[in-house]
Structure formats: C-alpha cells, structure tokens
Amino acid sequence: MSTTLALDIAAVLKKILAALVVVLATSYFLSMGLGLFLIYAMPQGLDAASRQVAELPFSVLMIVNFRIPLGVSVGFFFLMIWLLYTGAFALAWFDRPSFASSLRSLTRPDVWRSNYLVTLPQLASILFVAVVFLQALQESAGVQTGGISFESPVLGFLSISYAPLVEEFSYRITTIGILDGLNHIWKMHRVPSDKGRRNAIRLLILNIWKPERAKELLGYYTIRNDGVRRGISRFEWTVLVLTSGAFGAVHYLSGGGWEIGKISTAMLSGFAMGFVYLRYGAYAPILLHWFFNYYFGTFDLASQLNLAGGDFASFAVEFLNLGTGTLLVVATVAIYLMGTWSSKHHRT
C-alpha cells in the first residue's frame, strides 16, 4: 500500500512539475516578445532607440577588457542582442534530447539528462530562491547587497540585457572553456605531431562550444552519462570555484552601487552558470544569466513604463518563480529524507 501511495504521489508531482515547466518556459518566450514591444512600440522605448551606441565594452578571459567602436543606434543594438538570445533558445530547443521527450520523462534524479529548456525553469527558480534567501539572510545581519541605478529605465534595461552576453563570454566560455580544453589537450595520448596539432585545435574549439562533447570524444566521464560526481573532474571543480569567486568579487570591486553582499550572491549565480556551461555548452550560462537580467528586466521595465498590467505581470513572474523554486526545494529535501528513512527501515 505504501509503495502504491508513493508511486501515486510521484505521478502527481511529476504532472505538477511538468505543468510548471511549461508555464515558466512560456513566460520566457512572452518576455522576449514583450522586450520588442517595449523598445519599438512604447514612446519611451522609441525615444531611447533613436540614440547612438558609440562604443561597446567587451571582455575575454576575465581580465582582458577593452572597448569596441560601434556607432549604431540603440534600436539596432537591442535587436542584435535579442537575436542572439533567440539563437540561444533555438540551440537549446533543438539540442538532444528534445524538449518534448524530456518533459514526458521528467524526474528529479534525471534532470541533468533533460533538454536544457526543461532543466532551466527548475534550476533558475531554485537559484532565484537561493539568491533571495541568501540576500535576506545577509541583510538581516547588516551585510548590504546594494544595487545599480540608471538615468533612463530603457537604457538601464539595455545595459543589463547586454551584460549576460559579454560576462558569460568572458568568465565561462573563454576562461573555463579554454582552460578546460587546454587541460584535455595536455592529457591527450601522444599522436603524430601534425595530426596532433590539428586535433588539438579542433578539440579546443569543441571544448569551448560544448565541453561535454569534447569529453565524450576523449572517452572521459560526463555529467550526462555518469552523473555530477564522476562527470566533473577536480580540475574543472577548481576552475569553476575560481571563476565564480572572481565573478562575485568583480561585481563588488567594479562599483556602480553594488556593496559587499553582492559577492556571495554573484558567486553563487556564477557557480551555477559555470556548471550548466560544463554540462550543456555555451548557450546554457547565457540563458541562465538572461533569466536574471532580461527576463525579470522586461517585466520590471513594463511596470516602470506604466504599461497596462505591468505591475501585476512583474509581481506574477516573481511569485511564480519563487513558488516553483520553493516547491522544488521542499520536494527535493522530502525525497532525500524519505529515501534515507526507507534505507534505514529496510536495514532494520
């Protein structure tokens, strides 16, 4: 009877989780459309869109920072950002396994084997809850997080929308990707020199794009096939921690309104972004960072521009993500405790 009840509960939870994943994923796509509307249909958006972006801040390998002369309109620049995010979503959608098959076989232990668009709503909502909880805990102890402000809400939205692209390219794609790739090349078996050089270059490029694909090619353990404990090497854990720490520290040291409490929350987010990069590839950390900046930013901007229903939409997406994240945390803890109790019960 207890086994049947447990299976029934698991089936109900699976349906609820699948519904929440679909609702959250739908809200992601709605935010993409909303961003276009706010920039190209709202008067404040059109006014900002006519301005010029003279130069573009860029960064690689965390420490190499420079500016690229641009000279395009804000409207054109936002469209380029939007298309890059659309491309990232397309890569996630067409990646294997498919979104539909992952949704049908949705179970908590297999989350890292799922399509990223099934994993993202779960991970992002849990991370959102963790960041909110950590920030509240710190501020209750007098450690402030701070925040950044902009003279124009539209230009502020443009700035935070661009940040995931440049920051993920700098901290995850080039730093983790190149260091991890060089580590794999160093460990490769000896081959004839010309072939070895060609293989090394291809392997490095593949590792930057999709670290798991490179590891599969070399016959190494992967997260998807072998789990987290075996699928991430000690070297990768080390690089992941170091880049996450640097990501957190830079947010505070760069100023702009952030206070010391930002270090821990940014480090936590950076760790999650680095992790999904190792599992899914270059598009994954961009979309997780997009969730915090563009996704919430669109609904917040809609509220600031007094769009009809903007206040409610902004509240609703925060409530939905907090609720989903809390439910997942509680369910995960409950499943773990039930498993622990069951194993002890069988032993006795």
Kindly label every feature range from the protein language model:
Residues L20, L24-Y28, F78-T86, Y116-F128, ...:
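Alpha-helical transmembrane spans of integral membrane proteins, capturing the lipid-embedded, hydrophobic core
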Residues I126-G146, V241-W258:
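Alpha-helical transmembrane segments and their membrane-interface junctions
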Residues M1-L117, V132, A136-S140, G297-T348:
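N-terminal, membrane-interfacial amphipathic/helix-forming hydrophobic leader that caps
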Residues L5-D8, R108, S149-F157, S161:
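Juxtamembrane loop-helix boundary motifs flanking transmembrane segments in multi-pass membrane proteins
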Residues P153-R347:
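Transmembrane helix-loop-helix hairpins at the membrane interface
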